[in-house]
Each structure stands twice: as C-alpha cells, then as structure tokens.
Regions:
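SAM/dcSAM-binding transferase cores
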Residues: 2-18, 24, 32-37, 55, ...
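The AdoMet/dcAdoMet-binding core of the Class I SAM-like
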Residues: 6-7, 18-19, 38-162, 178-186, ...
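Short, basic/glycine-rich phosphate-binding loops at helix/coil junctions
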Residues: 24-32, 139, 168
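Intrinsic disorder/low-complexity signature
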Residues: 128, 169, 273-277
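Short glycine-dipeptide loop
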Residues: 163-169
Length: 285
C-alpha cells in the first residue's frame, strides 16, 4: 500500500494511500474513505448510501445533501451514476475537504462543498428541500469509528425538515440494532413523516443503512434502473455490488428484513466546532 499524500496538522495525521487502483483516506490510522474511478462500486458502504436514490419515484434526485463528506467517495458516486443538478456536501474537517477536492476529484461544477458543523448548518439553513439527504456523520474514538451525532428525536427532526416532498433520508448506522433504536424507528411522531423505511446491508460490514421515504418507493423499477449501469448490473459476472434489503420498521411495528441483492459501510468525522457558511445563490437554484 503506497503513501501518495500526507498531512500532519497538530496531533492529527492524514494519509492517502493507494491500494491497487483505489485511493484510501486515513485519519490517525482510521479508514475514512475509498474511491476508485475505474471501479466505483466495491461492495462497500458507499454503494449502500447511493442505492436508495434509484427507488425514488422521480427516478433521479435533483438536489442532494451529503452530511459527512469524508474523502468525497459518495459525492463521486452520485455524479457517476445519477448526475444530480446540485450536490451540497457539509464537512467539518477542512483537511478531508482538501482531500475530496484535490485527491478524490470531487470538483464537478454541480458540487458545493462547505466547511461547517452539520448541526449548525442545518439550524441556519433556509433554502429549498433536498430530494436525497445522506447522513454519514462518523467520528473515531480510540481507533474505532462511531456515529458522531446520536439519531435522537431532535436530530432526526432536523434532518426531516430539509427532505423535499417525494424525497428520502438515508442514514449510516454502526449496526442494525442502532438503526432500530433510532428515533426514526421508535418515535411515533417522527414515523408519521415517512411512507416506507428500508434497511440495506452487506455481508462484508456490520453497518446498517436506513432509507426513509416520504413517498412509497418504486421497487418494481429499482433493478431496471440499476441495470442501466454495468457496474450496478448484478446479472454481469464482473459486478461487485452485494446487498440485502428489507423493511426495517412499519407503521405497525418492527419487521423482519427480506430481499437479497448486495451492500456495505463507511466513516466520517466528529462535528464539534461551528464553522458555518452558506452559498445562498447556489443553494437556492
């Protein structure tokens, strides 16, 4: 594994290493992001965060909000497969943003990367809603990754406030148990906001991805939309997409997962400082 980029900032050491054709971002030895432009689908968590968008009734999210950019893998995947009109990425760590722009190549004209605390940014945001909101806010403690913001009623309500009609909220959890314990599954008031809740997972990671839809998703068109892209077409032997999905909760109570297909995991950083700024002209387009 070759070291291709290094930054020491105070006590924090940031490295980008090349493993084969993949670039990997490490912060203090903790793996945060991976992307390979030649093989953008790896069977990891980044695939899971992307997949729910293919079930939206619109067929494609026009406006996307990513909370926890890390090295920008999800941003690159979104543009590779869905080409939204706008992707807003909010990231607390300035070095991660530098890596996303300069190393991972998250530089497209439709991408607006902001250095900000996710909680502060949401509290101040007054623009239009987003068709897809991705919460991938992770930090690390003692060399282990963990969610940076608890999925309690306050945080989940703040997230729902920026999900557009017909949109979806996608959240990365450390485990299925953590997903099911979240306010999105347990709080009866918050549960009224969504029409369906799905759980995505992969055999390679313990993470569970929760996808909460404002309108009933189009699963009957889901596979057809994936198959447009060779990298997402599981009929092809070279396809690395591996996932399972199923209802994680219904309006009547918790349900058992069902359908198999293919998915994975990932990790960002801890929001603790308020670094707030917004490009209103871009966000309101």
């Amino acid at each position: 594994v070759a070291l291709v980029w290094l930054r020491q900032q105070g006590e924090d050491r940031y490295e980008v290493r090349r493993a084969g054709n993949s670039l990997r971002l490490y912060t203090n030895g903790v793996f945060h992001s991976q992307y390979n432009s030649a093989e953008p689908v790896t069977g990891s968590v980044w695939d899971l965060l992307l997949l729910p968008a293919f079930a939206l009734r619109s067929g494609r999210p026009s406006r996307v909000l990513v909370l926890g950019v890390g090295g920008g893998a999800v941003v690159c995947q979104l543009n590779r497969f869905l080409s939204p009109d706008l992707i807003v990425g909010v990231e607390l760590n300035s070095v991660h943003l530098q890596v996303a722009r300069e190393v991972f190549g998250a530089l497209a004209s439709n991408v607006c990367l902001l250095e900000a605390d996710a909680r502060e940014w949401l509290a101040h945001y007054r623009g239009p809603g987003f068709d897809l909101v991705i919460d991938d806010l992770f930090g690390h403690v003692g060399g282990e990754t963990e969610r940076a913001i608890a999925a309690d009623a306050s945080w989940c309500s703040a997230l729902w406030s920026v999900v557009a009609p017909g949109g979806a909220l996608v959240m990365n959890f450390e485990s299925e148990a953590q997903l099911r314990a979240s306010a999105l599954c347990r709080d009866r008031v918050i549960r009224r906001h969504w029409a369906e809740a799905q759980r995505f997972s992969t055999p390679h990671y313990a993470n569970a991805i929760g996808a909460f839809f404002r309108q009933a998703p189009e699963w009957e068109r889901f596979e057809t939309r994936l198959q447009v892209h060779p990298e997402l077409d599981q009929r092809r032997a070279q396809c690395r997409l591996r996932y399972s999905r199923g209802l994680c909760v219904s309006h009547q109570g918790l349900c058992d997962p069902t359908v198999k297909g293919g998915l994975g995991r990932r990790l960002p950083q801890v929001p603790s400082r308020a670094l707030h700024h917004t490009r209103n002209a871009l966000l309101e387009t």
